[in-house]
């Protein structure tokens, strides 16, 4: 498989699977020929510390032990037994340009080692998106992880799935479009794996529980070698394995007591990838969550 030179992640906190209910023209357009799902399984409990931590570390909360209070208080150890994606990439690619631009700064502070030379920034996402776009155009990063927080704020304030929550997803979709345009402006689209992911959803005005509206989330990716497909089975922690695979970096060996991040079936046409293992007994999902029926709203390929 072609190795990507750039991996860019747009994280939308609290969007869950509500993306399919919102007006998201940029999401629909960008990922129309990509791979996507509205039922990626979050980590349990469905809180930001546990979920973003699983994505960046490739392990479950029972292994990384991170939670909101912890990542807000303690910096991530530079010698932690579970290296972040940034540390794994830096070890394999010493000269890589790495960036972490997060509205919720505990992600960068409490989940990313501080000695890696990662370019970082934090402010409200309405201002941060401009800085993200400038960074993409100017630095053409090898790996950029971003987090937009206002959707989660709208869910807490007005209710997840409410009109105002869905409107904020629409606004985040505009930011997604700006970020993708920056990729085009930088001229790196032919070498970029571009991803969007939500950490969790919500119920009422909160989250942390295990209802479908809290635990099922949105993921989508597009790139030159990405196959157009509805991903049958995925856990949000799989973001780590997808990133390493795209950059041509060997992932750790799968272990139920350690690394449980995998490349979901269908994203890439590569029959050498390991068989996707059912980790529902570890993640708390229904066995083979791919059997859960759902409705997609991706714009069809006009050329198909």
Task: Describe the function of each predicted region.
Residues 1-304:
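Feature captures the catalytic ectodomains and active-site-proximal regions of enzymes
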């Amino acid at each position: 498989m072609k190795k990507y030179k750039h991996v860019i992640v747009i994280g939308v906190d609290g969007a869950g699977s509500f993306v399919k209910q919102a007006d998201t023209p940029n999401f629909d357009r960008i990922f129309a020929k990509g791979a996507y799902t509205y039922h990626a399984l979050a980590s349990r409990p469905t809180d930001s510390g546990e979920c973003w931590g699983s994505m960046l570390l490739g392990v479950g909360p029972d292994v990384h032990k991170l939670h909101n209070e912890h990542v807000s208080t303690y910096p991530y150890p530079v010698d932690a037994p579970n290296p972040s994606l940034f540390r794994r990439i830096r070890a394999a690619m010493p000269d890589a340009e790495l960036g972490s631009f997060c509205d919720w700064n505990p992600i960068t502070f409490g989940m990313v080692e501080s000695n890696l030379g990662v370019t970082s920034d934090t402010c409200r996402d309405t201002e941060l998106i401009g800085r993200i776009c400038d960074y993409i155009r100017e630095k053409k990063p090898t790996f950029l992880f971003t987090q937009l927080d206002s959707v989660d704020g709208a869910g807490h304030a007005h209710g997840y799935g409410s009109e105002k929550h869905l409107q904020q997803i629409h606004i985040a979709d505009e930011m997604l479009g700006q970020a993708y345009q920056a990729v085009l402006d930088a001229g790196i689209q032919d070498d970029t794996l571009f991803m969007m992911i939500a950490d969790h959803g919500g119920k009422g005005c909160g989250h942390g529980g295990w209802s479908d509206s809290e635990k099922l989330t949105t993921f989508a990716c597009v790139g030159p070698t990405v196959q157009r497909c509805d991903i049958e089975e995925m856990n949000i922690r799989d973001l780590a394995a997808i990133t390493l695979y795209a950059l041509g970096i060997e992932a750790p060996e799968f272990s139920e007591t350690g690394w449980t991040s995998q490349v979901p079936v269908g994203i890439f046409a590569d029959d050498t990838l390991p068989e996707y293992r059912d980790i529902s007994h570890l993640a708390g999902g229904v066995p083979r969550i791919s059997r859960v029926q759902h409705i997609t709203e991706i714009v069809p390929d006009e050329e198909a």
